[in-house]
Amino acid sequence: MEMDVTRDTVEVLPQHKFDIRSLEAYLNQHLPGFGSDHRAVLTVTQYRSGQSNPTFFLQKGSQAYVLRKKPPGSLLPKAHKIDREFKVQKALFSVGFPVPKPLLYCSNASIIGTEFYVMEHVQGRIFRDFSIPGVSPAERAAIYVSLVETLAWLHSLDIHSLGLDRYGTGVGYCKRQVSTWTKQYQASAHQSIPAMDQLSTWLMRNLPDSDNEECLVHGDFKLDNIVFHPKECRVIAVLDWELSTFGHPLSDLAHLSLFYFWPRTLPMINRGSHIQENTGIPLMEELISIYCRRRGIDPNLPNWNFFMALSFFKLAGIAQGVYSRYLMGNNSSEDSFLTANTVQPLAETGLQLSRRTLSTVPPQADAKSRLFAQSRRGQEVLTRVKQFMKQHVFPAEKEVAEYYAQNGNSAEKWEHPLVIEKLKEMAKAEGLWNLFLPAVSGLSQVDYALIAEETGKCFFAPDVFNCQAPDTGNMEVLHLYGSEQQKQQWLEPLLRGDITSVFCMTEPNVSSSDATNMECSIQRDGGSYIVHGKKWWSSGAGNPKCKIAVVLGRTESPSVSRHKVHSMILVPMDTPGVELIRPLSVFGYMDNVHGGHWEVHFNHVRVPASNLILGEGRGFEISQGRLGPGRIHHCMRSVGLAERILQIMCDRAVQREAFGKKLYEHEVVAHWIAKSRIAIEEIRLLTLKAAHSIDTLGSAAARKEIAMIKVAAPKAVCKIADRAIQVHGGAGVSQDYPLANMYAIIRTLRLADGPDEVHLSAIAKMELQDQARQLKARM
């Protein structure tokens, strides 16, 4: 749901009222910009959520802020440390982690009765109901993927570089948690609950051996503490850092997983039905797999039952504390009295989990598909894509071919025929859109590999699902490295399919197989950058919807390495100085359906400095991140193309006769068919292995697998296409059959994203390094 302040807030509760005029006077003096509108009056309302530290929405004119303060009255020791919240948010904001911008901390209790801090108000979506009603299953899955990826990001931060000295002890975290929450519970208990005592004893006796692991943990990481982008399934702010410290990361992951084991006798924390009744929510094992993949750790987590039991124990302790404050009259929420009845069921659930062995590895399907198993959602989407292709895409091939044949000499040849645009709207309506991007689709690379194979069977199918190159790579760049302004201006319309883009890297006057040869310059000039140089093989530049170019160039700096002199910048195609010189043919084919491949000149093009992506000298780094998944996407589609070619070959071999027998009865043709099937199975497995490596280890660690399939797939498919052409004779190279065009496409892939020879050299280097490490280990 869109965050609605009027619905999320109430009049300040009587026990939390404070002197608003005193606060306003203080903020006028200490918060820059707060008093700029002298006619505006400060209004204060209180958020319904926030059971611990009272949270308030401040509005003054067009300015909006959020204030967090300590609750009044007698408090439990070491609780409600507002200064710690401010400190950790300030540190996280400085490294780009999504938190509201912290603005001011006040330790002077005389201003509003307690210490407090103020942060920016973040406008977005907060989902109070874990089942996330009102969105499609695809969006629901993507929201949960983004949620767990953000948690993995938090746990991957280097705590020593955050400047949070003495923020937490870290080592021995689990033992301290059990001890702390036992004491907190005992200090606030209003009745005896045997399950709490038994669970406390079990936890203390079963502490994990890995209690020395430490990172920054949130302490209360769950769906309704997250602000999502208004339109995208992307986390833009993590809230409520009261319980954060240095500790064991699995405590956060277990807390996020509470709803998977929620007792049916108890209403859900965030309303909603139970997990089994919601389509699109990943299985717990799938969520854990995504988390572990992002952190590069083994998904088979030891002591998972301990962390789940600890989470229920901790939540029961929190519930008891909330009820205790209600009894004392300083509760932060209207419905605090309801928590009294939750303590015992939570404790009993934790006790039950302590006696179970919990698996964190996704369940496997049948033995045949066990090697690279798709997720439940991946299987569902693949089935729907296959059905969509069969019912809508393949039947449209003839109409699309006729359009480009009729418009080959007109400007309309660069546009999509109406049938493709209709198919795109249909695919979007069915949720089969942007499937390549895990944060949007909720799919893994293995999931997408098999989907991309299906779309590779038709020239224009990737466009139908908004999964076409080079837009997929450019959207990946903006998603991973773009600023909020860049995402809003360019990523959002790309994700909607309103515009397309072009990637400008290869140059006509240098050997582009060595990317460091680049001549195109990107030079700073005040508040702008000047882009000057020539690019070619800029795919998609001729599409009338192409509105933005992602340009790689040199920002010269003699004091750094040759891989630190490249930068990447966004250049709107209508900027003065951007010139489309000519389209380039591929074996005579113009590739109209994808907007062609163009030579583009940038003649002293001036763009704002804010168009630079990530920073100066980061271009090569971004390129490697972009090309990793992008390279295997090409290979995934090529497997589908190979299947289509083999189908055409077999049809011909069955229909035609030579020398008194069918073509397939000639041993040489039969062997070609057999060798083609073997080759397809080989490259499919290697493609899936590369996808699996990206899923589990990340793009950097999967470099060798990516390079291997980038060499193997196009080469194998070229051979299959050559055999099919040979089976067709002269017809195979004519316009009557698609084989010549297919061969042109796949032959080009042996050059695109780096030629075979560059990848072979890289593979050899990595193999020698691996062998050297193994030899050293044996010695």
From Swiss-Prot:
Substrate binds at S513, G628, P629, G630, R631, G754. InterPro entries: ACAD10_11_N (IPR041726), Acyl-CoA_dehydrogenase (IPR050741), Acyl-CoA_Oxase/DH_mid-dom (IPR006091), Acyl-CoA_Oxase/DH_mid-dom_sf (IPR046373), AcylCo_DH-like_C (IPR036250), AcylCo_DH/oxidase_C (IPR009075), AcylCoA_DH/ox_N (IPR013786), AcylCoA_DH/ox_N_sf (IPR037069). It catalyses: a 2,3-saturated acyl-CoA + oxidized [electron-transfer flavoprotein] + H(+) = a (2E)-enoyl-CoA + reduced [electron-transfer flavoprotein]; docosanoyl-CoA + oxidized [electron-transfer flavoprotein] + H(+) = (2E)-docosenoyl-CoA + reduced [electron-transfer flavoprotein]; tetracosanoyl-CoA + oxidized [electron-transfer flavoprotein] + H(+) = (2E)-tetracosenoyl-CoA + reduced [electron-transfer flavoprotein]; eicosanoyl-CoA + oxidized [electron-transfer flavoprotein] + H(+) = (2E)-eicosenoyl-CoA + reduced [electron-transfer flavoprotein]. It holds the Pfam family Acyl-CoA_dh_1. It is found in: Peroxisome; Mitochondrion membrane. One of its GO terms (biological process) is fatty acid beta-oxidation using acyl-CoA dehydrogenase. Its main location: other. Pathway: Lipid metabolism; fatty acid beta-oxidation. It comes from the Eukaryota. Keywords: Acetylation, FAD, Fatty acid metabolism, Flavoprotein, Lipid metabolism, Membrane, Mitochondrion, Oxidoreductase, Peroxisome, Phosphoprotein. Coiled coil: none annotated. GO terms for cellular component: cytoplasm; mitochondrial membrane; mitochondrion; nucleus; peroxisome. The modification Phosphotyrosine is found at Y323. The modification Phosphoserine is found at S210. The modification N6-succinyllysine is found at K368, K390. CDD domains: ACAD10_11_N-like (cd05154), ACAD_FadE2 (cd01155). Belongs to the acyl-CoA dehydrogenase family. Acyl-CoA dehydrogenase, that exhibits maximal activity towards saturated C22-CoA. Probably participates in beta-oxydation and energy production but could also play a role in the metabolism of specific fatty acids to control fatty acids composition of cellular lipids in brain. Homodimer. This is Acyl-CoA dehydrogenase family member 11.
